[in-house]
Amino acid sequence: MRKGSLKEVLAKIKHDPREDERDYYIVIEHRGAYGNEKKIPVEMIELGHGYFFIGETQIPYHRIIRVVKGNGKVVWEKRRRKQ
């Protein structure tokens, strides 16, 4: 499931001609949303150094919980802290 860093996974999805970014979405921590999670299609984001962008809005990478392919396969997931 977790192959490479988050930035590597997103860069591959965005720039590898064998991948179609329209087939992927990210799930971010979004307080106030149902379950405090929000899905965002990868095609809507632009990658930055410490943040990704949706239009003019900057969102830090640490808010990404998982990256999912449209078929439901999780390709990257944030490690959870042990309680």
Swiss-Prot record:
The lineage of its organism: Archaea, Methanobacteriati, Methanobacteriota, Thermococci, Thermococcales. Coiled coil: none annotated. Belongs to the UPF0248 family. This is UPF0248 protein TGAM_1209. InterPro entries: MJ1316, UPF0248. It comes from the Archaea. NCBIfam families: PRK04257.1.
